[in-house]
A protein has these predicted regions:
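Intrinsically disordered, low-complexity serine/threonine-rich segments
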Residues: 10, 31-33
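Extended rod-forming repeat segments used as scaffolds/tethers
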Residues: 10-11, 19-21, 105
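Extracytoplasmic metal-acquisition and chelation regions
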Residues: 33-302
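N-terminal secretory signal peptides that target proteins for export/translocation
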Residues: 1-14
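Bacterial N-terminal signal peptides
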Residues: 15-30
Length: 302
């Protein structure tokens, strides 16, 4: 019976409390720059990057930060509406991943507020896999844009922002080295997942991802076809795949069924949440995920 690993993943939010959008309209919209600059991030891993780049000059609020909460049940609150309304800078994923924040931004418009849509930085569009923080290019692009945005708002500390950006880029090198190492060892390895939370990283690692139609159906909240379910089960039972990744923060009966089949067949199972764990920065979170995948695949490596 394989051990179960844990790492982080992605967020989908489908329930919006429409009445709260109105609260954003009546919230204060005065965005005169003060110290520290107020940054709101829809996802906590983006908020962490804002803290690393902004340093002592920013105050960061991350809206989605509880790995024990089912993100599908996330509900807006008056405090969230106020935070977004009062922010100098708002960061969110985009491409239909966090549409609730777009509603709040429309409801509390401000010519002075800067908005960073992370998907736009790397040319992703609606319909693309939204778990873009696993694309190695994404985080570097966000850090660079944050530094530029903060310099424009606070040119007196230009050197500080640039120094923090340089340190951040340097801190990503161990992750890049780990990706290169795992790609050399495991490129071409057939793997699968109940949904495509790790898709961009699998691509960076050069792995062969199976059951993508099944994953796409789950991502779009539709029932996988009978043939897709049968193919998935067969891949697990016949050891056609070497690893199963599932979302431990928002699961359903069919995903739980695939986990049971994988464990019974001796396929390593790696579970993950949809927010970064408490007490970890982006770098330690990503390295932990890569380590979990490495441990799982090493158990059956030749």
């Amino acid at each position: 019976m394989p051990d179960e690993e844990t790492f982080g993943g992605r967020i989908y939010l489908h329930r919006l409390i429409g009445g709260l959008v109105g609260l954003a309209v009546i919230a204060s919209t005065s965005l005169a720059l003060a110290e520290p600059s107020k940054i709101v991030a829809a996802e906590n891993f983006y908020g962490d990057i804002a803290k690393q780049i902004g340093g002592p000059n920013v105050s960061v609020t991350s809206i989605l930060s509880n790995p024990d909460q089912d993100p599908h049940l996330f509900e807006l609150s008056p405090s969230v509406a106020r935070d977004v309304s009062d922010a100098h800078i708002v960061i969110y994923n985009g491409i239909d991943y966090d549409p609730w924040i777009e509603k709040l931004l429309v409801a509390a418009r401000s010519a002075n507020r800067k908005t960073i849509v992370v998907a736009d930085l790397i040319g992703k569009k609606t319909g693309d896999n939204p778990h873009i923080w696993y694309d190695p290019a994404t985080i570097s692009a966000l850090a660079k844009r944050l530094s530029e945005t903060l310099v424009a708002e606070d040119p007196a500390d230009k050197a500080g922002y640039q120094q923090r950006l340089s340190r951040f880029d340097e801190s990503l090198k161990p992750i890049q080295a780990k990706i290169a190492e795992l790609r050399q060892r495991f490129a071409g390895t057939p793997v699968t997942a109940t949904e495509p939370i790790f898709g961009y990283m699998f691509e960076a690692l050069g792995m062969q991802v199976r059951n993508q139609a099944f994953q796409l159906a789950v991502m779009n909240d539709t029932e996988p076809s009978a043939s897709d379910i049968i193919s998935f089960e067969d891949d697990l039972k016949t050891h056609r795949v070497k690893l199963l990744i599932y979302n431990s923060q928002a699961t359903d009966p069919i995903a739980e069924r695939m986990q049971k089949i994988a464990k019974a067949a001796g396929i390593p199972v790696v579970g993950g949440t949809e927010t970064s764990p408490p007490g970890e920065n982006y770098q330690s979170w990503m390295m932990g995920e890569l380590d979990a995948v490495e441990r799982a695949l090493s158990k059956h490596a030749p």
